[in-house]
């Protein structure tokens, strides 16, 4: 079964939302959708219609059509099952089933279609699972929003307090005016100007009678209700005049955020943006990406709670003509290694000859700029001796200080790049005192985390240490330690040894890249 496109169109054939699952030009998909209303007869009970090249499987939804475009060799029963799933998803994301409602929720519908259909094949998911996948709730995002809302509420309380103080001063000034202490006659209106983070004002005087009382009137400005403003109110003061603009306060606010560990993106010149090195797109017709992700939990006293390696072989083909290929692979015989192939891959050929090829030889691999995962594998049951990086933390309290010694030891089989060891610290007023370190360090005051960075760990520095001092703290405060790194080799050592063309001619040129990434690596 191959679903070419899933679309929602109007009765006249106007495309509202369309998601293509194969490489198809815009002109072709618009032509197919525009031709559909002419093929549907009135009063017929069929849910599909066929042409010379494609099959339309459809369902009316109020004044619209929910439509699947498939090839004629697809299984009509599976197509109808896919259509039923999409018909349940559309009302979940677009309660208003008209042109305006569908267009407003176009992106949500496309995301839902992607979760229901992959590479033209229906995924074994339910409506509830699709909604859960599309929500993508993040605990870190929720915590960040709560923290920002707390700051907003705190700022609002400060502004209310300042406003209350100004109102109190205004009432006191009114009493003084009635008592004859002011030399300015007539009513006054006190104008309060609030900045985003504080209350600001000018240093205008309010009368000669009040000058002898020693009251601080810099926090507000007064202006007569009617008539022209007086010269005293309009003339700029010397040294105490109102400062227009927020440049100085904005800079101070940004500096305070930087001190708390926030990442501030500042404006840069276009020339500097263009000068940044951007990753080059693949130039070879075929690119193979081999990636393994580590999920490791190590006990602080020794031993491993969890050691899981998950790998993926993904293929990127730039041109359709180069998609008629098979990949010959090889790997090390690692205990606990198990493979899982894509449903469209010939499993018998893979298990017997370690060849990655499509079930249908006449069907090429998908082409374009996106990678297609073909093979996945998992390695379980490895012990502590197989860890690429071991980290030990030794905190000790001595008097009014806590001395923390941390050391790492890397395995011989990997050269590790961009290593970052993040140690949580107790809440501190200032950065910890780092006495000795192999590498570089940075203190994130906002999250109270000390980051130890090593650019490269190879034969020259398989081990290293760091020592720092903080105020007295419980030893458990410095855990869990999070570790991040990458390597250019993998545990399985899986690689492509050659490409077999399925059609006459030379095999296309190919490149491959392997990477090991620490997705979740902790010492607890």
Curated annotation (Swiss-Prot):
Belongs to the adaptor complexes medium subunit family. Delta-COP subfamily. Pfam families: Adap_comp_sub. It is found in: Cytoplasm; Golgi apparatus membrane; Cytoplasmic vesicle, COPI-coated vesicle membrane. One of its GO terms (biological process) is Golgi localization. Keywords: Cytoplasm, Cytoplasmic vesicle, ER-Golgi transport, Golgi apparatus, Membrane, Protein transport, Transport. It comes from Oryza sativa subsp. japonica. Residues 215-244 are annotated as: Disordered. This is Coatomer subunit delta-1. It is a peripheral membrane protein. SUPFAM superfamilies: Second domain of Mu2 adaptin subunit (ap50) of ap2 adaptor, SNARE-like. Oligomeric complex that consists of at least the alpha, beta, beta', gamma, delta, epsilon and zeta subunits. GO terms for cellular component: COPI vesicle coat; Golgi membrane. Residues 283-524 form the MHD domain. The keyword Transport applies. The coatomer is a cytosolic protein complex that binds to dilysine motifs and reversibly associates with Golgi non-clathrin-coated vesicles, which further mediate biosynthetic protein transport from the ER, via the Golgi up to the trans Golgi network. Coatomer complex is required for budding from Golgi membranes, and is essential for the retrograde Golgi-to-ER transport of dilysine-tagged proteins. Transmembrane segments: none annotated.
């Amino acid at each position: 079964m191959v679903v070419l496109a899933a679309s929602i169109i109007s009765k006249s054939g106007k495309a509202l939302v369309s998601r293509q699952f194969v490489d198809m030009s815009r002109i072709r998909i618009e032509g197919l959708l525009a031709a559909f209303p002419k093929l549907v007869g009135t009063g017929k009970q069929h849910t599909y219609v066929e042409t010379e090249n494609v099959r339309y499987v459809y369902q009316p939804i109020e004044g619209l059509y929910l439509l699947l475009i498939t090839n004629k060799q697809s299984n009509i029963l599976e197509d109808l099952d896919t259509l039923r799933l999409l018909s349940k998803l559309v009302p979940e994301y677009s309660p208003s089933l008209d042109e305006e409602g569908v267009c407003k929720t176009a992106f949500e519908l496309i995301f839902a279609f992607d979760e229901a259909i992959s590479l033209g094949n229906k995924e074994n998911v339910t409506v509830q699972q699709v909604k859960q996948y599309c929500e993508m709730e993040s605990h870190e995002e929720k915590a960040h929003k709560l923290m920002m809302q707390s700051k907003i509420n705190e700022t609002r309380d400060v502004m209310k307090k300042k406003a209350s103080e100004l109102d109190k001063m205004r009432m006191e000034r009114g009493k003084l005016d009635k008592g004859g202490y002011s030399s300015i006659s007539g009513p006054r209106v006190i104008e309060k100007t609030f900045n985003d983070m504080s209350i600001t004002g000018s240093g205008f005087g309010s009368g000669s009678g009040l000058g002898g009382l020693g009251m601080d009137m810099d926090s507000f400005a007064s202006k007569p209700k009617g008539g022209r403003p007086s010269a005293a109110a309009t003339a700029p003061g010397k040294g105490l005049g109102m400062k227009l603009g927020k440049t100085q306060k904005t800079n101070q606010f940004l500096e305070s955020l930087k001190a708390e560990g926030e990442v501030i993106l500042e404006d840069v010149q276009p020339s500097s943006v263009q000068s940044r090195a951007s990753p080059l797109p693949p130039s070879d017709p075929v690119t193979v990406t081999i990636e393994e992700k580590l999920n490791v939990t190590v006990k602080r006293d020794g031993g491993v709670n969890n050691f899981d390696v998950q790998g993926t072989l993904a293929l990127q083909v730039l041109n359709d003509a180069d998609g008629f290929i098979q990949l010959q692979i090889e790997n090390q015989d690692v205990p606990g290694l198990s493979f899982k192939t894509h449903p469209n891959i010939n499993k018998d050929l893979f298990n017997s000859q370690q060849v990655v090829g499509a079930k249908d030889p006449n069907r090429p691999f998908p082409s374009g700029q996106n990678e297609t995962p073909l093979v996945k594998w998992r390695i379980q049951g490895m012990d502590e001796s197989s860890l690429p990086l071991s980290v030990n933390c030794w905190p000790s309290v001595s008097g009014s200080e806590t001395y923390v010694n941390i050391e790492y030891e890397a395995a011989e089989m990997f050269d590790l790049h961009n290593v970052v060891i993040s140690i949580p610290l107790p809440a501190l007023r200032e950065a910890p005192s780092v006495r000795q370190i192999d590498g570089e360090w940075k203190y994130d005051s906002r999250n109270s985390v000390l980051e130890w960075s090593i650019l490269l760990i190879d034969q020259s520095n398989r081990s290293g240490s760091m020592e720092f001092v903080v105020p007295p703290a419980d030893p458990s405060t410095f855990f869990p330690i999070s570790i991040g790194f990458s390597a250019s080799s993998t545990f399985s050592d899986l690689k492509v040894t050659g490409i077999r063309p399925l059609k006459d001619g030379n095999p296309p040129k190919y490149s491959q890249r392997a990477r090991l990434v620490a997705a979740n690596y902790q010492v607890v």
